[in-house]
Amino acid sequence: HKAGYFDKTLEAKGAIVNAATWKDYTFYYVTLPKGAEGKDLNLAIELHADMMLDPVLPEEEIGAPFELDNPEVTDKRERHVVIEEIRMRKDQNWTKVYNACNFNMYKKHPYKRDVIGTPEIISQVTRDEIMNYYQTYYSPENMTTIIVGDFDKEKILAKVEKEFDFKGRPNAPKKFNEIDTPTDHTIVVESKGQTNTSYLMFGFLGPKANQLKENIELDIVSIILGESTSSRMYQNLIEKQPEQIFMLANAEHYQFKDGNNFFVQANFKPEKKEKAIELVKKEIENLINNQITEEELEKAKKKIKSRFAYAAETVSEIGETIGYYMTVCEDLKLIEEYLKDLESITIKDLETTVKKYLNINNAVISILEPEK
């Protein structure tokens, strides 16, 4: 099919078509309107399979390789779109802080790289290299097809088996990434940027995504520490501070196949750098010193239950949840164990997990300050 046929045909049926990529996966999805379980669903499967198994990737859409410092390139194609996105993201202060932190959290693992790539690579990669990557990794063993909705299961399974015929394509080579261990000393990375305020990020390596109970425990800790205006960081660093030091203070937990990331971050006044670092560090250490309360634990559990329920409200969310557990955790049964594990977690469990993963000596601290 010609470029654009897939999108135009399905969008004419009322479908939403998109794709996304992250550290462990890329996913392509089609969401059809209710009532499209018959021929429209069959058409979507046919076109989706055609796109996944036999992409054309025309040279004229990718664009010819070019030198980055050549101002005469006027034929802007897909590679130029990606490069512009890289440049836009690179100018964002939080992206700078995160990239510096992430790069120094890993010694060898590919997670240290930026997912979107670099302008140097994107400007030079050839169509042959892209097709070779596709032929190597878009294989039966590496792909999961998920269909959620109200349809005849047996008929749709038969349709998927028919359309997704890889015609003997070999499976992708098994990749065994060397798992990095946390640093045994605090690493501080400092940089300058065009900003009026300063940015701070503490980064910690966590458990693998399929270590379900520890992951839920870190989700709970993230909520207690810094995920809302009632969190410890917001209350202690913003709401109750006698002088304004912080504009933002929060915590986030990202889950990855080979090991998660836990971030504690803040945006603060440049002249208060030492004080800001000390206060954020104190909040992390106080997860042990100032014991988590039953009230904090129950409130966080309630919030996680709501998220879990919300993830089952639409076909898109159900599909994404199944895809995550199939691809990143490699164990669909973990969905069934989730709420049971959540209910079993105690304050003592949280203390053990905090001591194990949120030790300041294992942190990478990234700081971005204004240029003088």
Task: Map each language-model feature to its residues.
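C-terminal regions of mature proteins
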Residues: 144-147, 291, 295-372
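A structural supersecondary motif
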Residues: 16, 201-205, 225-267
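Acidic/histidine-enriched segments that form metal/cofactor-coordinating
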Residues: 5-133, 282, 297-316
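Histidine-acidic residue clusters that define the catalytic metal-binding segment
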Residues: 38, 99-143, 175-179, 208-210, ...
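Buried hydrophobic packing residues in well-ordered domains
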Residues: 10, 28, 48, 82, ...
